């Protein structure tokens, strides 16, 4: 089985509530059961540099909206056997 887990937060990268605990632990447990899990979340500005420096840039692209040409980047970090993909966009995720 393949699972793409989308979340707004995950431990240890960023935490504001209980969702981060689940998003940080559930994928690890599913992997132990043989599930192929990938986690996708925003690349918030407040994610610690110790994690950011280990991320690999996968791609970047632009989305044309009515009023602007919007950048989005995709970064990857394998952490504790889980592949995390971070979506970079300063306008939406450049906050703490």
Model regions: which residues?
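Extreme N-terminal starter segment of soluble prokaryotic enzymes
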Residues: 1-3
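Cofactor-binding loop segments of dinucleotide-utilizing enzymes, especially the Rossmann-like FAD-
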Residues: 8, 42
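A short, glycine/small-residue-rich beta-strand->loop->alpha-helix junction that serves as a flexible
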Residues: 9-22, 48
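Low-complexity, intrinsically disordered short peptide segments enriched in small/polar/basic residues
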Residues: 19, 32, 60-62
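A short, Lys/Arg-enriched amphipathic alpha-helix followed by its capping loop at the start of a domain
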Residues: 25-35
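Hydrophobic anchor at the start of a short beta-strand
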Residues: 35-37, 84
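A conserved catalytic-core segment of Leloir-type glycosyltransferases
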Residues: 43-96
